[in-house]
């Protein structure tokens, strides 16, 4: 309360919002996070508790806490509907499952089956050409966005490294200790 009553509450809120725009893991927006300020020591002399001192301390404290927490990445997902003659059903289901897809349903009408699967959007690049090749051009497909799901933990380090490299950052994020004051 003492920190907030000295006008620093706005500094904390602003830094929280800034960190949430570009998190320390992948330099991507952060959501679903709460920070609770438990304690803060301020220098007695007002000249030593200005923005130049408090902003980096608050920002680094939030980033350090994030690195200590069990951070997850969310990836966009989509549902694919692929209608294909039964002769090419195996090839189409293989294309879906090879892209971390999960087949939810396969209703049939005559000699055409519709494969209904959920796939990460990141795995769908080239999907159109591969489905066309797998079905000799006989498949018809479309997709709908499903929102976001948690990236499987075993892919976390690989995907974070790819994102960071694409952004010109070193592949591994700074550890919690980097942000210690």
Where are these regions (language model features)?
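Single conserved hydrophobic/aromatic residue that forms the stacking wall/gate
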Residues: 1-12
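Short, contiguous acidic/charged loop-to-helix segments that flank catalytic cores in large enzymes
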Residues: 6, 45-49, 116-118
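A broad, structural surface signal
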Residues: 10-17, 59-63, 90, 94, ...
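Beta-strand-rich non-transmembrane domains
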Residues: 30, 34-41
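Conserved helix-loop functional segments at active or binding sites
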Residues: 14-25, 39, 60-72, 98, ...
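Glycine- and Gly-Pro-enriched alpha-helical subdomains that act as flexible
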Residues: 39-77, 81, 86, 90
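Charged, surface-exposed alpha-helical interface/stalk elements
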Residues: 75-181
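Flexible, glycine/charged-enriched surface loops at secondary-structure junctions
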Residues: 22-32, 68-78, 106, 141-142
């Amino acid at each position: 309360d003492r920190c907030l009553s000295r006008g620093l509450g706005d500094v904390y809120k602003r830094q929280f919002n800034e960190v949430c725009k570009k998190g320390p893991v992948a330099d991507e927006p952060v959501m679903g996070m709460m920070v609770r300020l438990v304690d803060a020591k301020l220098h007695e002399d007002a000249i030593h508790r200005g923005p130049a001192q408090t902003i980096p301390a608050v920002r680094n404290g939030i980033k350090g806490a994030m690195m200590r927490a069990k951070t997850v990445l969310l990836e966009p997902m989509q549902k694919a509907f692929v209608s294909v003659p039964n002769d090419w059903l195996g090839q189409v289901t293989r294309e879906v499952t090879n892209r971390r897809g999960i087949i939810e349903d396969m209703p049939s009408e005559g000699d055409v089956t519709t494969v209904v699967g959920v796939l990460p959007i990141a795995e769908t690049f080239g999907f159109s050409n591969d489905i066309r090749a797998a079905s000799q051009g006989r498949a018809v497909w479309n997709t709908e966005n499903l929102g976001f799901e948690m990236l499987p933990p075993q892919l976390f380090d690989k995907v974070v490294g790819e994102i960071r490299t694409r952004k010109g950052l070193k592949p591994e994020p700074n550890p919690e200790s980097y942000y210690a004051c």
